[in-house]
From Swiss-Prot:
InterPro entries: FGF1-bd
Gene Ontology annotations of biological process type: cell-cell signaling; fibroblast growth factor receptor signaling pathway; myoblast proliferation; positive regulation of blood vessel endothelial cell proliferation involved in sprouting angiogenesis; positive regulation of cell migration involved in sprouting angiogenesis; positive regulation of fibroblast growth factor receptor signaling pathway; positive regulation of myoblast proliferation
A molecular-function term among this protein's GO annotations: growth factor binding
Positions glycosylated per UniProt: 164
Superkingdom field: Eukaryota
Region annotated Sufficient for interaction with FGF2 and FGF2-induced effects, chain positions: 197-238
Span of the signal peptide: 1-20
UniProt record similarity statement: Belongs to the fibroblast growth factor-binding protein family.
UniProt entry tagged with the keyword Nucleotide-binding: no
Subunit structure: Found in a complex with FGFBP1, FGF1 and FGF2. Interacts with FGF1, FGF2, FGF7, FGF10, FGF22 and HSPG2.
Protein name (database record): Fibroblast growth factor-binding protein 1
Lineage: Eukaryota, Metazoa, Chordata, Craniata, Vertebrata
Compartments where located: Secreted, Extracellular space; Cell membrane
Length: 238
């Protein structure tokens, strides 16, 4: 009887130890899971902040085009897409233009760094920038799947240089002198006179007689040569 009680007591102690071990493990796992859940949003926020800093630092810059225009560019966000403004100086002239597009869909896939690098490279390759109304800034990373990411010029070149009063007066004088230019009389031009004379000579009786005589005596191959000599000898008006 005593042995039976000892066995039962030892069994109860073992069961209590197993239960306490399970409770301790459960208590350890709960704080770990909450810590991971708390850390994941903070890591996501940190990554988003870093990405936004990278994007902002790459959405403006300076460049020199192939035709030696010194320019700077900057991006502003709009309700639908973005505007990329370009301001340039070349040969003491200042001009600017704006390119517009919507690369939002492409930039969602962590392609912002590559996209802006390719935009900057495309700007440097431009020639006569802001002068062509069909200019488009394309990137390899986005242009196929996201054609709306191509930036198209929305307002062609805007000049800032103003015309001086002296140059303005010269232009006005040139315009006022235009009506006083000598007009050429087309009806009395040499070409018109020759054309009229040729048509009259074709119907002249003397010329017809000369051509007929030359054809009879000289043959078809020499008729023009003979007609020339007959014309010299007879001294017709034609």
């Amino acid at each position: 009887m005593r042995i039976h009680g000892l066995i039962l007591l030892s069994f109860l102690l073992l069961a209590a130890q197993v239960l306490s071990e399970k409770v301790r493990k459960t208590a350890k796992n709960v704080p770990d899971s909450t810590t991971e859940e708390d850390m994941s949003p903070s890591l996501g926020k940190a990554r988003n902040k870093q990405r936004s800093r990278t994007s902002k630092s790459m959405t403006h810059g300076r460049f020199v085009t192939k035709d030696q225009a010194t320019c700077r560019w900057a991006v502003t966000e709009e309700e639908l897409g973005i505007n990329l403004k370009v301001q340039c100086t070349r040969a003491d002239q200042e001009f600017s233009c704006v390119f517009a597009g919507d690369p939002t869909g492409c930039l969602k896939y962590d392609k912002d760094q590559t996209y802006w690098k390719q935009v900057a490279r495309t700007l440097r390759k431009q020639k006569n920038i802001c002068e062509n109304s069909k200019s488009v800034l394309k990137t390899r990373v986005c242009r196929k799947k996201f054609p709306e990411s191509n930036l198209k010029v929305v307002n062609p070149r805007k000049e800032k240089a103003e015309v001086s009063p002296r140059e303005h007066n010269k232009v006005q004088e040139a315009v006022s002198m235009e009506p006083n230019k000598v007009k050429v009389d087309i009806t009395t031009s040499p070409a018109a006179t020759v054309a009229v004379k040729d048509s009259e000579c074709l119907e002249d009786p003397d010329v017809l007689t000369q051509r007929k005589t030359a054809l009879e005596f000289c043959g078809e191959s020499w008729s023009s040569f003979c007609t020339f000599f007959l014309n010299m000898l007879q001294a017709t008006s034609c």
